[in-house]
Swiss-Prot record:
Active site: 371
Pfam entry (one): AceK_regulatory
GO cellular component, one term: cytoplasm
UniProt similarity note: Belongs to the AceK family.
Gene behind this protein: aceK
Classification via PANTHER family: ISOCITRATE DEHYDROGENASE KINASE_PHOSPHATASE, PTHR39559
Protein's name in the database: Isocitrate dehydrogenase kinase/phosphatase
Amino acid sequence: MPRGLELLIAQTILQGFDAQYGRFLEVTSGAQQRFEQADWHAVQQAMKSRIHLYDHHVGLVVEQLRCITDGKSTDADFLLRVKEHYTRLLPDYPRFEIAESFFNSVYCRLFDHRSLTPERLFIFSSQPERRFRTIPRPLAKDFFPDHGWETLLMRILSDLPLRLPWQNKSRDIRYIIAHLTETLGEDALPCCHVQVANELFYRNKAAWLVGKLTTPDGTLPFLLPIHRTDEGELFVDTCLTTTAEASIVFGFARSYFMVYAPLPAALVEWLREILPGKTTAELYMAIGCQKHAKTESYREYLCYLAESDEKFIEAPGIRGMVMLVFTLPGFDRVFKIIKDKFAPQKEMSAAHVRACYQLVKEHDRVGRMADTQEFENFVLDKRQIDPALMALLRQEAPEKITDLGEHIVIRHLYIERRMVPLNIWLEQVEGQQLRDAIEEYGNAIRQLAAANIFPGDMLFKNFGVTRHGRVVFYDYDEICYMTEVNFRDIPPARYPEDELASEPWYSVSPGDVFPEEFRHWLCADPRIGPLFEEMHADLFRADYWRALQTRIKEGHVEDVYAYRRRQRFSVRYGAISSTANSS
């Protein structure tokens, strides 16, 4: 190879990342206009297109590098020099951490995910941890109640870049003050102040004002979801001030925020204080840097592995017919492999399953579908694998595994947040906890359906319970769009004997779903059946599902709230707008 080619390759990769992140910011910057114009379908399209940008630009760089090297092979020393040159470009680079992930992605694409070693990749960052640089402009602005909280909040809302009129700004300010007074106490409020992020966080049909509320007892989140009425007027829907509420808003089962972040590392550090339970990976995920979040997730896994002597075991719960799932007993994530062969009733291919997982990645997850990270050639030390799991891997997925002696390489897997399987949770709880779980399950089904997602297999085992008690769907092999399903009523029996027959007396075509049948497996437990009939009986009616389909086909996009309906100002203090009810 000619001298100096290593530097040219390093510069080409970094320039490719610059182009990718520039487009990322460009798509993100359109969020305000999409919100103001209520162009909700454009919101959904922008979300999908932004996700695809990263892989698209990796592909462009790979093609450039193949032209530069003229297809000639590169030896190990050459690759090390490329990484050394790239590392030297990063100390003064503002998005160094994601640039390292982009380098990794280009390398993996070029070399088909082989020879993934720390010498060739940025397995860990080359830069000091949480590197602080001089920030060209502050990320947030401070507001103090020198002239009272009403004046403070009026300044905050008036400073927003939104160009729509307010429905009733004074009313919203009264509601915010009422909430803060109830939460903090009237005496504490004058001693508090607020720091507000300069950029709004857009998602679905809301623009979120994200801030920090400094009190005598510490710092709390200060979150205001701003919505628009059908008439184009702004209103604040609620005020959230607990870390648990903020954690749900920034949760792993929600779509990524659109927030303009030219310095993502600085924004992540700023958010960390109000989201103490979130890992670095989760914070990057929340602001839409999902590929770097994957890097951080892998680093968190390696750090856990280095400090633990646990062995990988099969994950608790009913064994899946499509996926083999394993975990580390104390780790908060699970590893999912597509089996080589599925149970006979699962008439699908591995390619179909991967397409379903990609659909979830790109779709609005409405807080009810867990996000995943996809890995290839994932290496495990055999000494850390329980013998029972090793036997299961060899039995269920031998074609996905390469034996390297002391290690195995898993050709493809997903990593996903670990939850308590809902069927296990329901066995362990009684009373109000049981009622809450059934209410949450039904709400999850409704919200998925409203977002044009039909889970397919609605058994409790395919859902999990998060640490906040939310029910989240995580088994995607039968997922499809609501508009692809034919919801039917079961025809009346022709004769009494029909209902006793082993085969149905009516024809069933692919895509047919009979909601009346849900009752058989959802209400079999006598503790659960009455609760389900009380709260969610309409899920057993085909006309309920067909009505949702009609709304979807007419182009209606449902409102999605990251908090309970009872927390909305319209419920707590009075009517606000004519927008749809919270689900």
